[in-house]
């Protein structure tokens, strides 16, 4: 073979090898593309961790979590059929209260994006519990937090976030424009009640599964307001209480029965010497029990209980262990309003067990500071101040605020009874801490257990002032 032939042969072999290599590379690219397409399919999931997809169809909640690991989608599915919450169970027997959640939102908000809020509360479906709150349309440590001590403004909204998490724009769900609110789940969907508008013409907007279903106009034109805690659902019906009228005298109080977001019945309480505001309600053996705030003239708490036909009974907690703030020192109680230090008040709660009562209250008689739970074995009906158990929740030196009840249904817990729980708002900032320009709060929650519990203090713990305050 002469030199020219050798050169031609070597060149031909090189070209052939190059073509084969190119074909292999093209095949490799096609293979990678096809493999990726098969993995992602029509779902078109991005690489976001813990993306939650909730689909509602044929009365079944399908809850799936997609976790992307090395381009491989692992799907953990859990189907839970919707069910109407019966609400017929009695309260679980308990010996004390176990710490359930603490969101530390003020501490986190000094550096992170956390909403300025007040009036947080908790409500549970048969699948989950959520924290609801009234935001001020502002973030902590930001200029729009200035002046958020104001209760009613067009910037306030009811929102919710996963239980125990600090409420932020990244984990919160909008529910309703509102400066007074309530929410509850009937086993099929969320009912939300959001009140907004001027003092002399506010309107309550009812939503069911996020869709407006009805409105209720202020009937006295004097600051229509509702519970600031969960409403109660039983056998497909949900119940709430609203107040319209003076905060320092006799007002108008109505109970509403609501089905799938629509009012099916309402009554006005005949209670001329009573004052009901910001009621904390819970189901117990097929009835609804509400323990409320008397802002007019009672340092003990008024109550109203009613059945599903709205037949009702009213009274005041008789115990000499007084539950409101401000209040006198414990002493002789009354089954009528205890008028000593009876003006003003704070949202609170109690749980009735026969003739006994668990009373939640601030430790201070004058300031919204500290919190404790007291068991008075005869306090629902007797007027003495004897009690048999006290559990410390927040120390006297630390700020508290509103408190309220919520329950966990047997459909959630698997128990054969209704688990009683409560939350406490830990308010910081104005008007008491005047080194700040804002008012907001974090929250803690506890649930009743028939086992050992701890006495301690779980305060807010944020160091004030913030950068925006200086």
From Swiss-Prot:
Matching InterPro entries: Glyco_hydro_34, Sialidase_Influenza_A/B, Sialidase_sf
Region (Head of neuraminidase): 91-470
Involved in apical transport and lipid raft association: region residues: 11-33
Transmembrane residue ranges: 7-27
UniProt PTM comment: N-glycosylated.
Enzyme active site: 151 (proton donor/acceptor), 402 (nucleophile)
Alphabetically ordered keywords of this record: Calcium, Disulfide bond, Glycoprotein, Glycosidase, Host cell membrane, Host membrane, Hydrolase, Membrane, Metal-binding, Signal-anchor, Transmembrane, Transmembrane helix, Virion
Subcellular location: Virion membrane; Host apical cell membrane
Glycosylation sites per record: 44, 58, 63, 70, 88, 146, 235, 434, 455
Residues noted as binding Ca(2+) in the record, renumbered to the chain: 294, 298, 324
UniProt binding sites for substrate: 118, 152, 277-278, 293, 368
E.C. numbers: 3.2.1.18
Domain comment quoted from the record: Intact N-terminus is essential for virion morphogenesis. Possesses two apical sorting signals, one in the ectodomain, which is likely to be a glycan, and the other in the transmembrane domain. The transmembrane domain also plays a role in lipid raft association.
Subunit and partners: Homotetramer.
Function: Catalyzes the removal of terminal sialic acid residues from viral and cellular glycoconjugates. Cleaves off the terminal sialic acids on the glycosylated HA during virus budding to facilitate virus release. Additionally helps virus spread through the circulation by further removing sialic acids from the cell surface. These cleavages prevent self-aggregation and ensure the efficient spread of the progeny virus from cell to cell. Otherwise, infection would be limited to one round of replication.
Further remarks about this protein from its record: The influenza A genome consist of 8 RNA segments. Genetic variation of hemagglutinin and/or neuraminidase genes results in the emergence of new influenza strains. The mechanism of variation can be the result of point mutations or the result of genetic reassortment between segments of two different strains.
UniProt-recorded name of the protein: Neuraminidase
Source organism of this protein record: Influenza A virus (strain A/USA:Memphis/10/1996 H1N1)
Classification lineage: Viruses, Riboviria, Orthornavirae, Negarnaviricota, Polyploviricotina
